[in-house]
Each structure stands twice: as C-alpha cells, then as structure tokens.
Amino acid sequence: MEDEEEEQTALVCDNGSGLVKAGFAGDDAPRAVFPSIVGRPRHQGVMVGMGQKDSYVGDEAQSKRGILTLKYPIEHGIITNWDDMEKIWHHTFYNELRVAPEEHPVLLTEAPLNPKANREKMTQIMFETFNVPAMYVAIQAVLSLYASGRTTGIVLDSGDGVSHNVPIYEGYALPHAIMRLDLAGRDLTDYLMKILTERGYSFVTTAEREIVRDIKEKLCYVALDFEQEMATAASSSSLEKSYELPDGQVITIGNERFRCPETMFQPSFIGMESSGVHETTYNSIMKCDIDIRKDLYANNVLSGGTTMYPGIADRMQKEITALAPSTMKIKIIAPPERKYSVWIGGSILASLSTFQQMWITKQEYDESGPSIVHRKCF
C-alpha cells in the first residue's frame, strides 16, 4: 500500500494475553503478530558499551530470553501492568506497523467483563500518551462472531490467558449470560510442563516454557473419547510422537498429547473446581432467553488459539449434543483462521462506513474525559 492510501486508515490492535495481533483495517490478516512479553536483563551488562537496553519487547525479548526475565503485562485477558503495556503499544505502532499513532484512529479489543477502570485507562493512554485522533474499544468475542459472518451465535473464545463463552444476539453481547473460565493456553502449557516432568524431562525456566508451548502447538490434540484414547495409548505406541529440543535431544511424547488439552473439558486435571468448556457453553445458553437458544445452539463459533487443537470441534459437538435437548440442531463452527478471528472482525468493523460515527474522537475525549468510553463502546 502507498503512504497516501494509508493516511487515516484505522489501526486494529488485538491485545491478547499471549500474542499481540496488529495491522490495518481492511486487511484480511494482521501485519504484526508477536508475543505480549516485556523482558528485562537478569544481570548487569557484561558487554560494556554494547548498548544494552533496559527492556525488550515481543520477538526480540523472545530471542534473548536466555538472559532476560520475561513478564506478560496481560493476565487472564486483563491488563495488569500499564507501564509494560505502554511499551508494547509503543513497539506495535513504531517498530512493527511503523506508523504515527497521531495520524490514525485506533480500534482496541478487550476481554468480556473487563473492569470499567481498565477501559478508561486504555482510553486515557491512547489519547494522552499516543495522541490518537480517535479510538474505540470492542469486545473480543463479538469481533470473532462478525468475522464468521454472523450477528447471532455463541462464541467460545479461548486464548492464552482466559476463556469465555459469550452469547450474542443481533450484534449485542448478553452480559448476564457470559461465562468466564480462567483456564486457557498458558495453563495448558504449564500442565504439559508438569506431566512431561513426570516422564523425566525437566522444564523449569521461562525460556523452557516457550519450548513446551511449541510442543503443545505442534503435537497436542483433543481426543473424541478420552478413556478409549488412554487405553489405546497404554496398549500400543501408535500415538507416540517425537520432538527435537533446541539442543538436539529428542523427547518422546505419548498420552500427554491429548491429556494436556483434555483439561479444557476436565479442569479437575489441574485442580480447578470449574466446569469444562462444554458445560460452560451449555450453562451460558441456558442463561439466555428460551426463544433465542435454538439460534445459539446452531451457531457455536470457536475462536482463539486454544481452539486450534485438532479434534476439538468434533468433541464439542459430541459433548453439547449430550447436554442439549435431543431434537436440537447443534452446529460447531471452527473457521480455519480462528486464531486471528478477533483481529479479522476488528478489521471488518473498523472499515464499515456505518461504523465511522462510532469512533470516540479526541474532541469528545477532551470534553468528557475517559468515562466517555462507557457511553460509546458497548
């Protein structure tokens, strides 16, 4: 794209607990996807005059992880460290997208049931630190639904830090029926570290956790019938796969491949008393008006990286069919690009002509202050 064309194009930034997805409205995929990490040196610099920075963001932090302490400013989908978050946004605009934020409207995303103070602080930072001309905060799950071409349905959005079931009717999330589950990709990575340790492999540091995350993404899957899969794994080696560690050591992983994501259906695996995602989906539907349940059952949309496991859609279909009334038509929609569907939905929304009057402008912000966000974004 030429510079003239990018003048005033809205920026879309989906801040996840694990990955930041950022790019330009109207694009079909984010230009920049990088880990939501800020790393700081563990030791005082040895290499004098090497121009060591006091902090690194994203991929650079990832590549220097051996000498850094890595921190995630977003926990369970909610921003907990604002100074680090500001560093991440700065990095997004200036290093990744290479734009001046004061020239573009910015669409940010937030977790459902985000505390009010949080969206006010986001709004304040955008206008006061980055001087944006206009901004908007949209709920992640709603954007995923738009990306699937629907305005009614129930979204299971599961990322790195948090999972939600969000029923949406004609474009509006129904807050009383939203289910939040503090169980997501990061917990699955930790659980995989634990069960691999039981097998005799040791993974402890933040750097090693990233290796385990890679094993999880490449080799894990959801079993259709967990008990049966366990029996198969016990009696044969057909489910075993090997993985080469960065130092050349090869490890073998068997039933861990499906025991790890099974936690989404059986949170008791990691000592959580919560219901699994199939039950939270059902409970969320049951909290909705009886007249719209049929539409929700027929439009179960999966979104987020933790829904990327092979086999998850079939398993959800099976589990929800078992819970729902026997005559109910149940459909699970798992778009192939669901890892980025929140961002894609944001890209669609920000480029709609009807959306242009929805932006919070700098002028409105100056008149009303941060609380304007509650009146304009819902």
UniProtKB/Swiss-Prot annotation:
Major place of residence: cytoplasm
GO MF annotations in UniProt: ATP binding; hydrolase activity
Keywords: ATP-binding, Cytoplasm, Cytoskeleton, Hydrolase, Muscle protein, Nucleotide-binding
Coiled coil stretches, renumbered: none
Cellular component terms (Gene Ontology): cytoplasm; cytoskeleton
Enzyme kind, highest EC tier: hydrolase
EC annotation from Swiss-Prot or TrEMBL: 3.6.4.-
Pfam families (UniProt xref): Actin
Catalytic activity: ATP + H2O = ADP + phosphate + H(+)
Subcellular location(s) per record: Cytoplasm, Cytoskeleton
Cross-referenced SUPFAM superfamilies: Actin-like ATPase domain
Homology family: Belongs to the actin family.
Function: Actins are highly conserved proteins that are involved in various types of cell motility and are ubiquitously expressed in all eukaryotic cells. Multiple isoforms are involved in various cellular functions such as cytoskeleton structure, cell mobility, chromosome movement and muscle contraction.
Protein name according to UniProt: Actin, muscle-type
Organism: Molgula oculata
